[in-house]
Structure formats: structure tokens, C-alpha cells
A protein has these predicted regions:
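Short loop/helix-cap segments at secondary-structure boundaries that form the rim of catalytic
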Residues: 74
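Residue-level marker of structural boundaries
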Residues: 70-71
Length: 102
């Protein structure tokens, strides 16, 4: 498994705005990127920085996505830095869409 982290200037001014914007494109990431396991977006309102974390099944899948024109354009337009990591262990795993019982 491969972990990829992108850092860039915040895409939206608040976490609520980022959530509303990114929820529109979640289906693309769920269906159109081979080998992608999950992908959260994050923002830090205090620092004005944003991040995306990708988990891929393998390096070939990660490289295919990050070499795509869409990703190259995003990184160029947003001065994004990118770093790849081999995943050594996972501490906890559950679906994000799981409903919590009260």
C-alpha cells in the first residue's frame, strides 16, 4: 500500500466550504481512479494550508494518477508539494460513511 500526501495553499476559506465543494466530486474519486483506496481532503484555517492524503493499493496505481494531466495541472496551479510513502501498518480501519449509533 502506498500513502501520498499533497500540501498546498487552502482551496477554500473554511472547512465547511471545502466539504461542500469536495462532496460534489467524491463520486469521481470513488469510481474513476484505479487502485485508490481512499482520499480525504483537509484544511487548516489558521495557517491557510490544505492537504490531500491518498491511499493506493500499489505504486503503479499511484504513479498513474499522479502522472495524469489532471493531477499535474492541479499541482502546478496550486504550488502543491507531493511525497510518497510505503505504508508499514494501519492502526484502525472503518468506513467513513458508517453510521454511529447513539
Amino acid at each position: 500500500m502506498i500513502l501520498v500526501i499533497l500540501h498546498y495553499p487552502a482551496l477554500m476559506p473554511t472547512v465547511e466550504a471545502l466539504r461542500a465543494d469536495k462532496e460534489k466530486i467524491v463520486p469521481f474519486f470513488e469510481k474513476e481512479i484505479p487502485g485508490l483506496i481512499d482520499k480525504p481532503w483537509g484544511t487548516n484555517e489558521k495557517t491557510g494550508r490544505g492537504a490531500s492524503v491518498y491511499h493506493f493499493e500499489d505504486m503503479a496505481s499511484a504513479e498513474a494518477w499522479f502522472n495524469s494531466e489532471r493531477q499535474r495541472d492541479f499541482r502546478a496551479q496550486n504550488q502543491a508539494t507531493i511525497e510518497f510513502f510505503d505504508v508499514a501498518a494501519i492502526a484502525y480501519k472503518r468506513p467513513l460513511k458508517e453510521k454511529v449509533s447513539v
